[in-house]
A protein has these predicted regions:
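Short, glycine/polar-rich helix-capping loops at beta-to-alpha or helix-loop-helix junctions
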Residues: 53-54, 133-144, 205-212
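NAD(P)H dinucleotide-binding glycine-rich loop of Rossmann-like/cofactor-binding domains
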Residues: 29-34, 43-109
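Mid-domain Rossmann-like dinucleotide-binding core that forms the NAD(H)/NADP(H) cofactor-binding site
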Residues: 78-157
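N-terminal Rossmann-like NAD(P) cofactor-binding module of classical short-chain dehydrogenase/reductase
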Residues: 165-168, 194
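Glycine-rich beta-strand-centered segment in the early N-terminal region that forms part
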Residues: 1-9, 14-52
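Glycine-rich phosphate-binding loop and adjacent beta-alpha segment
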Residues: 174-248, 282-283
Length: 283
């Protein structure tokens, strides 16, 4: 019914993602999608990497399916799931103790995933949400933030930000180092740094730049969040709640549905770059 084409799918198609490093042709780079059971008419979310989904039909193990509400829009769910799940899974499965009552910083808050993260963190009970980005105008338009900080070299946080508990980083690169060095940490608590994305893919990784003494000077926990970070049990537990959440929230970006038959034409198009591409069955 619908398959999203987020950045990770594009990276897999180009063999620039770890999950596709050993791929051989023919290769289907899809991650997940929405399917229709032709025998019952029921809609299902298909769990990540359960089957190749750039196809008219797919044979899926029932354990990899999450039933959706009959009124769910397949295109909407397919467009949102990757962007929303990145912060949902990070805050529910990676952040120790979750984000309830805590301060969450989103580095790269103007990205599609960053915008979704603000909505997710609020729904999961974060007490304060701070967004960081280089662009003042687009940062001002991000909904759900309590405070906004412009990313400027040397990438330091103002003292007015106060103590932080969780830092979700969608950018990576040198900015994270300056932010961790200048971040305040509440006594008795850890600052949990979770790298979720790598928008600064051309820059050196923060672990290459991080002064080793910093993790001795501050109680900092450094971790990643991605497909290899979660167990099958994590996914089965979280997906029903995530799907229910996705069907109710406001979409924070434009969606571009296109027929599967036009995949070559739309893959690198301007619409696919500015909007969130979702492939649907050809008529």
């Amino acid at each position: 019914m619908a398959v999203g084409v987020p950045r990770v799918v594009q990276a897999r198609a180009a063999c620039k993602h770890p999950s596709a490093s050993n791929a051989s042709l023919p290769f289907d780079p899809s991650i997940d999608g929405i399917g229709l059971d032709e025998s019952t008419g029921e809609l299902y979310y298909i769990n990540p990497l359960s089957a190749p989904l750039f196809a008219e039909r797919a044979n899926i193990n029932q354990s990899q399916l999450v039933r959706l509400d009959p009124e769910a829009d397949p295109v909407r769910v397919a467009a949102l799931v990757n962007f929303v799940s990145s912060s949902w899974m990070a805050l529910k499965c990676r952040a120790i103790g979750g984000c309830q009552g805590r301060t969450v910083v989103i580095v790269g808050a103007t990205s599609a995933s960053g915008r979704a993260a603000a909505i997710v963190a609020r729904s999961l009970g974060a007490a304060r949400i701070i967004g960081l980005s280089r662009n003042e105008d687009t940062l001002a338009a991000v909904e759900g933030l309590d405070d906004r900080v412009l990313l400027r070299e040397p990438f330091t946080l103002p003292e007015s930000v106060g103590p932080l508990h969780i830092m979700l980083d969608y950018v990576g690169g040198p900015a994270a180092v300056g932010l961790l060095q200048s971040a305040q940490v509440e006594p008795g608590e850890n600052l949990q740094y979770i790298q979720v994305g790598g928008l600064a893919s051309d820059a050196a990784h923060m672990l290459q730049l991080l002064p080793t003494h910093l993790i001795n000077l501050k109680p900092i926990c450094i971790m990643g969040s991605g497909m290899g970070s979660f167990t099958k049990q994590d996914l089965r537990r979280e997906m029903p709640g995530l799907m229910s959440f996705i069907t109710k929230i406001k979409v924070p970006f434009e969606i571009y549905p296109a027929p599967m038959a036009d995949v070559q034409a739309v893959w690198g198009s301007e619409n696919a770059t500015k909007k969130r591409l979702v492939l649907v069955p050809s008529l």
